């Protein structure tokens, strides 16, 4: 099972218009690198709670404050419409399945509600791309 690549334009629209994400990310300034196995990697840049850009080209040399990384299989489980046990959220996936949440732990813990909502929005974008 492989992860569905995320539509970054749709993701940017979702992030900018989702009231829960906007509320939880207020005052956040961070670069979030997302690594979906070998299939896709991108960086979300947030400045003062607003999406500044989503960079679709990320290298191992690019800096980040937070990294969400896992294999394609882990991401497939996380992005499923009904995720299997312990894949409903990044933190239990890290504890039980080896998913990685890395970077500035103080920022991660302070803004975890925004990071968790990010996962929900990733799921909504991925589910909309699955062919019927």
Label every model-predicted segment.
Residues 1-132:
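Feature captures hydrophobic
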């Amino acid at each position: 099972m492989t992860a569905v690549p995320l539509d970054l334009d749709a993701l940017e629209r979702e992030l900018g218009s989702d009231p829960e994400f906007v509320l939880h990310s207020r005052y956040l300034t961070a670069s979030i690198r997302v690594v979906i196995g070998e299939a896709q990697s991108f960086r979300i840049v947030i400045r003062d709670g607003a999406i500044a850009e989503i960079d679709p080209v990320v290298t191992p040399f690019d800096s980040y404050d937070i990294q969400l990384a896992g294999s394609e299989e882990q991401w497939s489980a996380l992005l499923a419409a009904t995720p299997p046990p312990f894949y409903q959220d990044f933190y239990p996936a890290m504890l039980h399945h080896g998913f990685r949440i890395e970077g500035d732990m103080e920022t991660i813990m302070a803004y975890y509600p925004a990071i968790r909502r990010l996962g929900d929005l990733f799921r909504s974008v991925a589910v909309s791309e699955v062919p019927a």
